[in-house]
From Swiss-Prot:
This is Cysteine desulfuration protein SufE. It is found in: Cytoplasm. InterPro entries: Cysteine_desulfuration_SufE, Fe-S_metab-assoc_dom. It comes from Salmonella choleraesuis (strain SC-B67). Pfam families: SufE (PF02657).
Amino acid sequence: MAVLPDKEKLLRNFTRCANWEEKYLYIIELGQRLAELNPQDRNPQNTIHGCQSQVWIVMRRNANGIIELQGDSDAAIVKGLMAVVFILYHQMTAQDIVHFDVRPWFEKMALAQHLTPSRSQGLEAMIRAIRAKAATLS
């Protein structure tokens, strides 16, 4: 994974933002930190359906059984939200991902109430897709 903060630092940084404009800019910055996705990984198998933007997420299990996530989107805010999700699932096994509830983290960040309905649906689609694929790997 690219140089991203851990869960606790993400929450600290997010709460230090003075307003929602700063928070959106921080989310976009997180997306910019994601590693470049290989062009051949932008394929139908990795496409996340249910997002208005184009979104691709690749999951691989490393030698230690930890899931490594990579992704990309054609929308900066969506790519940033993807980075937030990747931070929350960082260093987890497939089974950990299946059982981990991201919603309390989103509540702490007050994220859901500040996203448009289409962004919220896209975020949910990303989470559902990651959890579904993790279930097949666990």
